[in-house]
């Protein structure tokens, strides 16, 4: 048994704070109430005075690199990094080697996750065979085997007819399509956002229209097919406007953005910082403001990390040779608290909604809720703690965080999943 004393409970649905004790028996929340009797001989007692207890988080977009790229990350190391950040459900993208484009690969991911992961790992299947963009994968079999979505993430499905057919099949099989929106005719060879910083650094720029053109295309295709389109890692103000318009039309479209897009601008690239090379690229302050407004209004539904680990040798090279991507599991909550709550007045309940209720709804899962009879999946956070992101403290196998050296507020101290304490006072037990 676990007894959490003096909890300030935040549930994303009603957005109300409740001060109470929480008794966990086996894998469920047995009781929530005032002054629950302590029994130190039979209980693990955790005093959370001054801290907050909230449902654990879900990430619908990450890269675990297994199979094929285990030198960057693997299912076990990535799951531990996710756990360190408060995530107990993560959805891994199919751009592995070989790609997750058939039922056997879906089965492999599920088997490996069950074998080595302390948390829930859900596979995303490919839209096209080999992520080639040329021939649809066997979407029905992929769904039947347990994929929670389909995506060619890392690549855009450039053929509009292929994308249209994918949406039609996805509707029949009730599976969302996660779209990586990037017109490669515009972005090819680009390194960073096209603008002031690309001009002064001499790095080739990627026009913002590379994203918004495909966002517009896919919205129109979703409107026609009536399929569930999810637009991932939104980074521009134009994309926000297009998604808002689509929702006003009644299109079945959802969207996410990432912590780095709501906090950092293209100026992070100055000095040729390869950890700031991400895809889509970091944009401008105007884009940040539009994304934050989109989150406030519900135009952008949730936050994903797009956790993209790369070996140091793939980052410690000339900028135009460096791999794109940043790790994100371990900093996500703290970045959101620092940049949305502290700097933009968001309610803490809204953050829980962005990391729990909404992402789970998008992939068809019930939310994690702190309620009697529900599974004990929760995190304890210290909202006052300030910490610097340092390479030596990163759990992920790769250390390529765009937030290295940044000072963040709030810290995920303890994580309980299915009634088991997997992280306590900042230390993982798995």
Swiss-Prot record:
<comment type="pathway">
    <text>Pyrimidine metabolism; UMP biosynthesis via de novo pathway; (S)-dihydroorotate from bicarbonate: step 3/3.</text>
</comment>
<comment type="similarity">
    <text>Belongs to the metallo-dependent hydrolases superfamily. DHOase family. Class I DHOase subfamily.</text>
</comment>
<keyword id="KW-0862">Zinc</keyword>
<dbReference type="GO" id="GO:0004151">
    <property type="term" value="F:dihydroorotase activity"/>
</dbReference>
<dbReference type="GO" id="GO:0008270">
    <property type="term" value="F:zinc ion binding"/>
</dbReference>
<keyword id="KW-0665">Pyrimidine biosynthesis</keyword>
<feature type="binding site">
    <location>
        <position position="153"/>
    </location>
    <ligand>
        <name>Zn(2+) 2</name>
    </ligand>
</feature>
<feature type="binding site">
    <location>
        <begin position="63"/>
        <end position="65"/>
    </location>
    <ligand>
        <name>substrate</name>
    </ligand>
</feature>
<keyword id="KW-0378">Hydrolase</keyword>
<dbReference type="InterPro" id="IPR011059">
    <property type="entry name" value="Metal-dep_hydrolase_composite"/>
</dbReference>
<feature type="binding site">
    <location>
        <position position="153"/>
    </location>
    <ligand>
        <name>Zn(2+) 1</name>
    </ligand>
</feature>
<feature type="binding site">
    <location>
        <position position="310"/>
    </location>
    <ligand>
        <name>substrate</name>
    </ligand>
</feature>
<feature type="binding site">
    <location>
        <position position="63"/>
    </location>
    <ligand>
        <name>Zn(2+) 1</name>
    </ligand>
</feature>
<dbReference type="InterPro" id="IPR004722">
    <property type="entry name" value="DHOase"/>
</dbReference>
<dbReference type="InterPro" id="IPR006680">
    <property type="entry name" value="Amidohydro-rel"/>
</dbReference>
<dbReference type="InterPro" id="IPR002195">
    <property type="entry name" value="Dihydroorotase_CS"/>
</dbReference>
<dbReference type="Pfam" id="PF01979">
    <property type="entry name" value="Amidohydro_1"/>
</dbReference>
<feature type="binding site">
    <location>
        <position position="95"/>
    </location>
    <ligand>
        <name>substrate</name>
    </ligand>
</feature>
<dbReference type="InterPro" id="IPR050138">
    <property type="entry name" value="DHOase/Allantoinase_Hydrolase"/>
</dbReference>
<feature type="binding site">
    <location>
        <position position="279"/>
    </location>
    <ligand>
        <name>substrate</name>
    </ligand>
</feature>
<feature type="binding site">
    <location>
        <position position="61"/>
    </location>
    <ligand>
        <name>Zn(2+) 1</name>
    </ligand>
</feature>
<feature type="binding site">
    <location>
        <position position="306"/>
    </location>
    <ligand>
        <name>Zn(2+) 1</name>
    </ligand>
</feature>
<dbReference type="InterPro" id="IPR032466">
    <property type="entry name" value="Metal_Hydrolase"/>
</dbReference>
<feature type="binding site">
    <location>
        <position position="233"/>
    </location>
    <ligand>
        <name>Zn(2+) 2</name>
    </ligand>
</feature>
<dbReference type="GO" id="GO:0004038">
    <property type="term" value="F:allantoinase activity"/>
</dbReference>
<feature type="binding site">
    <location>
        <position position="180"/>
    </location>
    <ligand>
        <name>Zn(2+) 2</name>
    </ligand>
</feature>
<dbReference type="GO" id="GO:0006145">
    <property type="term" value="P:purine nucleobase catabolic process"/>
</dbReference>
<dbReference type="GO" id="GO:0005737">
    <property type="term" value="C:cytoplasm"/>
</dbReference>
<comment type="function">
    <text>Catalyzes the reversible cyclization of carbamoyl aspartate to dihydroorotate.</text>
</comment>
<dbReference type="GO" id="GO:0044205">
    <property type="term" value="P:'de novo' UMP biosynthetic process"/>
</dbReference>
<protein>
    <recommendedName>
        <fullName>Dihydroorotase</fullName>
        <ecNumber>3.5.2.3</ecNumber>
    </recommendedName>
</protein>
<feature type="active site">
    <location>
        <position position="306"/>
    </location>
</feature>
<keyword id="KW-0479">Metal-binding</keyword>
